[in-house]
Amino acid sequence: MRETYRRTLQQRIAKRRGLALNTKPNQSISKAVIEFIRSTVVRPIHMLVTEPIVGFVCLLTSFQFGLLYIFVVASPWTFETTYGFSLGAQGLTFSGFIVGTMFSYAAIIAGDRFLYQRKLHQFEHEHQAPGTATEFPPEHRLYNAMLGSLILPSGLFMFAWTAEYAIYWVVPIVAQAITIFGSIQIYVPVSMYMVDTYGPLYGASAAGASSLSRYTLSAVSLLFTLQMFKSLGTGWATSLLGFCALTMAPIPWVFYRWGPMLRARSKYEREL
């Protein structure tokens, strides 16, 4: 992909034009370490707790990531206890995730090409006057996420109440495909929305906050998944996840409607 980091681009332009590069004075090791910690640890955590966009995007992406790990543990257990699947057959049940993932990325590519890119070209045509610094709203990234917010809880509830011995085992596998389809529809667009919102200067820090929350929840989810499914059963354990997804479903819609207001209040100004 093309380089997008502003400082790197400025350095390349200056070098190409034979201009003097603005270099920072040499720092001591202690100051360099402090600066490194500030930009890679302190800033992401600060953005996580002070920036609503970062906080809610991290909540969404962490749930999607944790959901994947939950199903890695819960799905084999469900098909073993409900349908008596062998170890090899349990592995084949993940074919639903494979199919759902393939269709999901096809939908994301289609959404980018036929919705996002079309809106972008229209915006550029309307704001092509010289000196115009108007920025294309990153909220247009959220079309697929709004769709996924409706599909994900539907897939979870479908899996919850079709994973029964009396119902053919293909049905819950289809429900898994629907679930992962909706999950990826949310995960990819909201991550891109956050990076677009904070730009090349602070986008990496926002992504760092997302990584911190994602992997923390993923690690924690493995500690309670099997106990939760054994205690509540597949129906109510997955329904609990469905209710969580349903509670978070409005987030992409809120971003699309009030995102400009939230961005205007941000402490991390995006550089054009």
Please place each PLM-identified region on the residue numbering.
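Short coil/turn segments at secondary-structure boundaries
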Residues: Q11-R12, L59-L60, P172, I251-P252
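Short acidic/histidine-centered micro-motifs embedded in hydrophobic/aromatic stretches
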Residues: E51, T61-S62, A209
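C-terminal transmembrane bundle
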Residues: F65, Y69-I70, P76-L272
